[in-house]
Amino acid sequence: MKKSKGSIESEISKSITQWEKDYLGRGSVSVKTDILRDMIIVNLKGILTPAEYVVCGSKEGMLSIKQTRSELVESGIEGLKDIILKITGEKVKSFHTDLSSRTGERVMVFKLCNDLEKNLEKIL
């Protein structure tokens, strides 16, 4: 039985939450994944600790938190790419991420080698 787009998105969200817990030591409050053409867009909410919000009160602190958090995520990119490959069967061509120090949200964009959304439409 083929998986639906929604079930794949849900599986990616759960797997990335588990990766966060295993690799970073804590997970997000909520994760939402969307497949759009050749991209997988993951929105993670509630990733900053209360102490990090305080540090983000100054420009230097905010830049420090953003840089450190980005380095942590990017140091584990191979694990994230493996999650996407295992669930979708698609290789990741590039990875982009950013963190909002104001809202505590992170957005991850996995750019794939193929149009996953179109391929799923053919299967379903």
From Swiss-Prot:
Domain of life: Bacteria
Pfam families: MpsC (PF10057)
InterPro entries membership: MpsC (IPR018745)
Protein name per the record: Uncharacterized protein YbcI
Organism: Bacillus subtilis (strain 168)
Gene name tied to this protein: ybcI
